[in-house]
Amino acid sequence: MSSVEELTQLFSQVGFEDKKVKEIVKNKKVSDSLYKLIKETPSDYQWNKSTRALVHNLASFVKGTDLPKSELIVNGIINGDLKTSLQVDAAFKYVKANGEASTKMGMNENSGVGIEITEDQVRNYVMQYIQENKERILTERYKLVPGIFADVKNLKELKWADPRSFKPIIDQEVLKLLGPKDERDLIKKKTKNNEKKKTNSAKKSSDNSASSGPKRTMFNEGFLGDLHKVGENPQAYPELMKEHLEVTGGKVRTRFPPEPNGYLHIGHSKAIMVNFGYAKYHNGTCYLRFDDTNPEKEAPEYFESIKRMVSWLGFKPWKITYSSDYFDELYRLAEVLIKNGKAYVCHCTAEEIKRGRGIKEDGTPGGERYACKHRDQSIEQNLQEFRDMRDGKYKPGEAILRMKQDLNSPSPQMWDLIAYRVLNAPHPRTGTKWRIYPTYDFTHCLVDSMENITHSLCTTEFYLSRESYEWLCDQVHVFRPAQREYGRLNITGTVLSKRKIAQLVDEKFVRGWDDPRLFTLEAIRRRGVPPGAILSFINTLGVTTSTTNIQVVRFESAVRKYLEDTTPRLMFVLDPVEVVVDNLSDDYEELATIPYRPGTPEFGERTVPFTNKFYIERSDFSENVDDKEFFRLTPNQPVGLIKVSHTVSFKSLEKDEAGKIIRIHVNYDNKVEEGSKPKKPKTYIQWVPISSKYNSPLRVTETRVYNQLFKSENPSSHPEGFLKDINPESEVVYKESVMEHNFGDVVKNSPWVVDSVKNSEFYVEEDKDSKEVCRFQAMRVGYFTLDKESTTSKVILNRIVSLKDATSK
């Protein structure tokens, strides 16, 4: 990784302005990629504004990852073949998908190289579009211009055209049709109340800005705010601190050390954020260290999953290391411990060790503790037997290396812990080199020391381990990191243990370890929960020394709030019934313009055609005319359709032989007496049009509505076992759901990153190619995302969370 000075110098050399350079170097992933891409160009290449922008664009796509054949794209840019950001995007996707097999010809074909669209051609398509939508434009006038731009931009015939030519042409042609703007195009003035709110809001903002002190976060208050500064943790050998500070430069250094023996769960997200976030807040560094000391339970899939989840949460390790990297040094220190008279080889059985530690036959502590018969063997004998363990002369269980601590201590962590055991298992990284493996209690503190960790942050279950942690470092004369403990995060109403989740998977109660009803991080991601929502949630909880037990509903509430601010809206019908408007012709079309997120113009808007046939929710119609609490469609009560000019009124029903409603006939109440206003309905409902012209509706293969997996808050307490507590309605699958055709735009633009989202405190840049980033609010139904099993011909949706309030009126 290049230094900031090197990055700044190179970016300035190719012509980026100082302000832009400062902006670029703030993003390490993008700046590192940009540096490498520039280095792939000839040293005498004459950069211009366009090529700088396009290569910067490419760097933002690469963002720190390895991209084989990236030189194909760079050469395409500097040779003038790739002229637009759209072409660069297409070229990037092609090279990313094909890797080393990528060719210049293949890239050019996939990115529109050589396709020239003239300004006259653009104008012809714009004029054609305006003619086709003339009535709507005449009605809605200039406020429709942004929508025209969006629609023209999406015309397949103009895919490779320069979008910079669109706006001036659209402006010219709209002006020809409508003439200059007049009073019809003026934006209505805000009311006095709105102005007052604005003033109060500005005052409040000003007051907040004026308040002294840094912004409050989980990293500068509570447990984390009270942590020691680098260099303040005491040492048995003060000279070691001097060496430590020289290595670290006085900066914070933390680590996240998972065991690669399973998938991470929601509790680990807090550990990830605490360790990576604390280091980042203090401009320090954080390791991702795999504690791979038990080869019998480790598997490559766990290593990869852990890396994915750390990256998904928005963190990049300073270095990825493995405890196995240090096996040679750990072995050397074990011999040092023996030579110092502080370790011995023990041949006791597991039961004998328990009795020596005062564990009674019924498993309870409190019995008399006594020394093992091997404890006072000579140093020479212990050293020889330990080497025999290393050389495979003992079978598993026949010999262990134990630390000689203090059996009179009240802490179980000082009762001669095991340091090494014999395991005849090949290691994923070291193969068959070792027949003995260090334990967590021996490895953890020493590797922390080797990596010069300044703050060894772990959960309170390891509180007693602090004494043995410090004891071992001191006995082998190494730097002693400071272990500090915070409360773990638990979610009630579910299970997090690997054994129980494995049982759920093996017995087919769930689809797999990433089933959206589980709380593994893989499952939460598949369900569609944004990583930013998790970080925001953890920040809200803060960090203390108390264990945090959170109900699922509270977690979902936090996710819902995050989604509310960051997702577009679409009309979607879960359980559809067809509606036919009898007083409208088959070719009737009324275009409704609907914002993707009301109140946030930057999300844009879309057009939905109202025709003489559409779908509504089956539950939005009731034959009961006496229910005064039901505000939707009934035989004697009209209902409004979202963004449609008039209400619809019931006319008749069609039912099948079983009595199920298959079609509702209505009238469109568009005949209003002159001088009168349309009658306002009691409520509005969502609808999805039936229109072959617009390829509507989009039919959903499966809509999976997820509820809590278990019926109680503590499944493990069920007298017949946790499996008996499973909620039979935890997954409800709908096979006939429909939604508006604009879902295609949502997929194309996902993740939906507008400025208000990108500038939020916990925004995390996500992989555009992952299906779960395609999130949206199904109006009046819930929040949904694409499931990983979806294909171009098969749409499968997962419900992330429900809306706040169930629709009851």
UniProtKB/Swiss-Prot annotation:
- Biological processes annotated in GO: glutaminyl-tRNA aminoacylation
Q: Which NCBIfam families match?
A: glnS
Pfam annotation, one family: tRNA-synt_1c_C
Q: Which family does it belong to?
A: Belongs to the class-I aminoacyl-tRNA synthetase family.
In this chain, ATP is annotated as bound at 259-261, 265-271, 459, 488-489, 496-498
Q: Which reaction does it catalyse?
A: tRNA(Gln) + L-glutamine + ATP = L-glutaminyl-tRNA(Gln) + AMP + diphosphate
- What would be one Gene Ontology cellular-component term for the protein? mitochondrion
Q: Which residues form a coiled coil?
A: none
Which GO molecular function, any one, fits this protein according to its record? sequence-specific mRNA binding
Which positions does the record annotate as the modified residue Phosphoserine? S378
Question: Where does the motif 'HIGH' region lie?
Answer: 258-268
* Record's protein name: Glutamine--tRNA ligase
Regions of biased composition (Basic and acidic residues) lie at 185-198
* Residue pairs linked by disulfide bridges in the UniProt entry: none
Chain ranges for the short sequence motif 'KMSKS' region as given in the UniProt record: 495-499
Q: Which organism is it from?
A: Saccharomyces cerevisiae (strain ATCC 204508 / S288c) (Baker's yeast)
EC number from the UniProt entry: 6.1.1.18
Residues annotated as region Disordered? 185-216
Q: Provide the residue positions that the database annotates as binding L-glutamine.
A: D291, Y440
Write the record's keywords in alphabetical order, separated by commas: Aminoacyl-tRNA synthetase, ATP-binding, Ligase, Nucleotide-binding, Phosphoprotein, Protein biosynthesis
EC main group: ligase
